[in-house]
Curated annotation (Swiss-Prot):
It is found in: Cytoplasm. IGPS catalyzes the conversion of PRFAR and glutamine to IGP, AICAR and glutamate. The HisH subunit catalyzes the hydrolysis of glutamine to glutamate and ammonia as part of the synthesis of IGP and AICAR. The resulting ammonia molecule is channeled to the active site of HisF. NCBIfam families: IMP_synth_hisH. The gene is hisH. Gene3D superfamilies: 3.40.50.880. It catalyses: 5-[(5-phospho-1-deoxy-D-ribulos-1-ylimino)methylamino]-1-(5-phospho-beta-D-ribosyl)imidazole-4-carboxamide + L-glutamine = D-erythro-1-(imidazol-4-yl)glycerol 3-phosphate + 5-amino-1-(5-phospho-beta-D-ribosyl)imidazole-4-carboxamide + L-glutamate + H(+); L-glutamine + H2O = L-glutamate + NH4(+). GO terms for molecular function: glutaminase activity; imidazoleglycerol-phosphate synthase activity; lyase activity. Activated by the binding of either IGP or PRFAR to the active site of HisF. Its EC number is 4.3.2.10, 3.5.1.2. This is Imidazole glycerol phosphate synthase subunit HisH. Pfam families: GATase. GO terms for cellular component: cytoplasm.
Length: 201
């Protein structure tokens, strides 16, 4: 199994690399690579990490010719997983960067959290509909996704606002929190992602 982690800017890339590496220890024949430019062959599982500004994140993907590379994985029904800003980039657009198109892999947009206490930072509970472990995960973000209920995989409440903290459309997954910073439960979640990718379900 080949796992790729897009590496084109800030985004806790090495933390995610180490987290995925630890999560893969119970699986055989797993290789993990950092991806800075398109490859001729596709990965079984591709991560899009990221922190910071929506517009900047899309600019880096565009300048490194990675937008079509990501879309090819979706077209070939490979698993694509967005983490933090990477999850937001899966959507069509964001209030943070008016006029900038996202990857548009999931219908919906990204808006600012209503709370005056921003960013939403620290441990908070994620309630999943299925597949992944409920519990407390680590968040650092100011914006949140808005999408159809059918794409909401997990929810979180912050300062009275309930928002999608995990989304799914087929084999496209998004996690607003940082599994790589979420201790044992984050490792369990990453193990489950690898398991799903291996079984192609």
């Amino acid at each position: 199994m080949r796992i790729g982690i897009i590496s084109v800017g800030p985004g806790n890339i090495m933390n995610l690399y180490r987290g995925v590496k630890r999560a893969s220890e119970n699986f055989e024949d797993v290789s993990i690579e950092l991806v800075e430019s398109p490859r001729n062959d596709l990965y079984d599982l591709l991560f899009i990490p990221g922190v910071g500004h929506f517009g900047e994140g899309m600019r880096r993907l565009r300048e490194n010719d990675l937008i079509d590379f990501v879309r090819k994985h979706v077209e070939d029904e490979r698993y694509v997983v967005g983490v933090c800003l990477g999850m937001q980039l899966l959507f069509e657009e964001s209030e943070e960067a008016p006029g900038v198109k996202g990857l548009s892999l999931i219908e919906g947009n990204v808006v600012k959290l209503r709370s005056r206490r921003l960013p939403h930072m620290g441990w908070n509970e994620v309630i999943f509909k299925d597949t992944f472990p409920n519990g407390y995960y680590y968040f650092v973000h100011t914006y949140r996704a808005v999408c159809e209920e059918e794409h909401v995989l997990g929810t979180t409440e912050y300062d009275g606002e309930i928002f999608p903290s995990a989304v799914r459309k087929g084999r496209i997954l998004g996690f607003q929190f940082h599994p790589e910073k979420s201790s044992k439960i984050g490792r369990k979640l990453l193990e489950k992602v690898i398991e799903c990718s291996l079984s192609r379900r």
